[in-house]
Swiss-Prot record:
Name of the protein this chain belongs to: Cytokinin riboside 5'-monophosphate phosphoribohydrolase
Example of a GO MF term: cytokinin riboside 5'-monophosphate phosphoribohydrolase activity
Cellular-component GO terms for this entry: cytosol
Catalysis performed (reactions): N(6)-(dimethylallyl)adenosine 5'-phosphate + H2O = N(6)-dimethylallyladenine + D-ribose 5-phosphate; 9-ribosyl-trans-zeatin 5'-phosphate + H2O = trans-zeatin + D-ribose 5-phosphate
Modification after translation (UniProt): Pupylated at Lys-74 by the prokaryotic ubiquitin-like protein Pup, which leads to its degradation by the proteasome. The proteasomal control of cytokinin synthesis is essential to protect M.tuberculosis against host-produced NO.
């Protein structure tokens, strides 16, 4: 295990990811992201669970000496197995509070393959950025085409005027961790 990185790291990245599937490639991707965030001396903020991709991203960050901040609503403490190894574990009353704290504590967002909860977090952060609440990078890592259907639908909304080009430009889509971290890095 590496020495702990100073908790006052210059940069904090929220990772939105799955809490259910255990596909090897998903867990490997999440672990790669967690290790890469820690390797840069950045802080990881994530959903606070110790299952699926959430557990993999946080465990890998800590294994590489990174500082981890988990944010979990009390209704999910047992369902998502709250990660009591987190350097800081924040238990909220609601999902909304979880998302707000994660957004407030982060300088950038990485979205990994996930389901409805991941999409909820993505759309919240993306909408807030589009509306000018923040100017933080929002980066979707999609190495296997998990989000192809979503992206096709969004492009259809763009083509018909329901989504603006400016909004689409706020969402960066990459297929590897190196490019994701580059897109998240401070300018």
């Amino acid at each position: 295990m590496s020495a702990k990185i100073d908790i006052t790291g210059d940069w904090t990245v929220a990772v939105y990811c799955a809490a259910s599937p255990t596909h090897a490639e998903l867990l490997e991707l999440a672990a790669e992201v967690g290790a890469a965030i820690a390797g840069r001396g950045w802080t990881l903020v994530w959903g606070g669970g110790h299952v699926s991709a959430m557990g993999a991203v946080a465990s890998a960050a800590r294994a590489c000496g990174g500082w981890t901040v988990g944010v979990i609503p009390k209704m999910l403490v047992y369902r998502e197995l709250a990660d009591h190894d987190a350097d800081e574990l924040i238990v909220t009353d609601t999902m909304w509070e979880r998302k707000q704290i994660m957004e407030d504590r982060s300088d950038a967002f990485i979205v990994l393959p996930g389901g409805v909860g991941t999409l909820d977090e993505l759309f919240d952060a993306w909408t807030d950025g589009y509306l000018g609440t923040h100017d933080k990078p929002i980066v979707m890592v999609d190495p296997w085409g998990h989000f192809d259907g979503l992206r096709a639908w969004l492009n259809g909304l763009l083509d018909t005027g329901y989504v603006s080009p400016t909004a689409m430009e706020r969402l960066v889509v990459v297929d590897n961790v190196k490019d994701a971290l580059r897109a998240c890095a401070p300018s």
